[in-house]
Amino acid sequence: MERITVTLGERSYPITIAAGLFNEPASFLPLKSGDQVMLVTNETLAPLYLDKVRGVLERAGVNVDSVILPDGEQYKSLTVLDTVFTALLKKPHGRDTTLVALGGGVIGDLTGFAAASYQRGVRFIQVPTTLLSQVDSSVGGKTAVNHPLGKNMIGAFYQPASVVVDLDCLKTLPARELASGLAEVIKYGIILDADFFTWLEGNLDALLRLDGPAMAYCIRRCCELKAEVVAADEREAGLRALLNLGHTFGHAIEAEMGYGNWLHGEAVAAGIVMAARASERLGQFSSTDTQRIIALLERAGLPVNGPCEMSAQDYLPHMLRDKKVLAGELRLVLPLAIGKSEVRGGVSHEVVLSAIADCQQA
């Protein structure tokens, strides 16, 4: 069992990583006998895990209710968020309740925002079931729902009480979802850790076949990197923005193509290559390193080009709504070398459009 702490003073919390955690009541810190819980999951995961998690909590004396939501990025919305509030109010659940997010990034983000909002804030626990949510979205307290005009535009910074990563969940993950998570894994190597990127080049095949020790190390390293960044810059005033490599381009793809048609990691993968091409055009990044990135993404089964249905011009309206925009100026996360990156303002639209055009599908 691995345990990492996200250090935020009185709001610090553990990330527990191991196989078989759903069998252990002690995994679900800080729940105790007599607590009230609302389990939030989706229609795909409920048959797989809901009864198992409910059972282990009830055997520990926890009072458990549940709400099952539709599955998909398109349901990460205010309308579906209201379903959670209604379920909480009907029981009813008070300020001493705990929401448990049992699912991937959509469930985690939506449940976290529900917890931040319900009766001005209640406790919640992240139980991520996808690789993407285990290495990224469950850690750090970013919670949100989407708006038709932009991804994650309505939300709050709100930290969980704990994160429970059961490696066994990856056994039921579709191959496309596994690849989507690997985009975020590869991102960490590009922006923060050249040695980890090199390790990924040598161990990607092991990750694709869900090798236990390799996957445990991979998730632990990603969580360590994320925890260090969040501890230093919880509200994304500087360093934390680096975690958005590829996301400004990727969010444009998700919004333009319709949420759910491109998985988040797929869009981020294409966006990472666009960011690398932009950095190349600015003389900040080598074409050799871009090719290393492309090769690793392709081995992971990820796209390295944007959708053929989008022109370069289609990206800009979405990118100009990005949360990093200041005074109407685009700010992009750009790689400088494998393991090093920066947030750069003043990147011209010409450079951005050229980088996108370099990465458009024929």
Swiss-Prot record:
Subcellular location as annotated: Cytoplasm
Function: Catalyzes the conversion of 3-deoxy-D-arabino-heptulosonate 7-phosphate (DAHP) to dehydroquinate (DHQ).
Domain of life: Bacteria
EC number(s) recorded for this UniProt protein: 4.2.3.4
Gene name of the record: aroB
Species classification: Bacteria, Pseudomonadati, Pseudomonadota, Gammaproteobacteria, Enterobacterales
NCBIfam families in UniProt: aroB
Keywords: Amino-acid biosynthesis, Aromatic amino acid biosynthesis, Cobalt, Cytoplasm, Lyase, Metal-binding, NAD, Nucleotide-binding, Zinc
Source species: Salmonella enteritidis PT4 (strain P125109)
Record's protein name: 3-dehydroquinate synthase
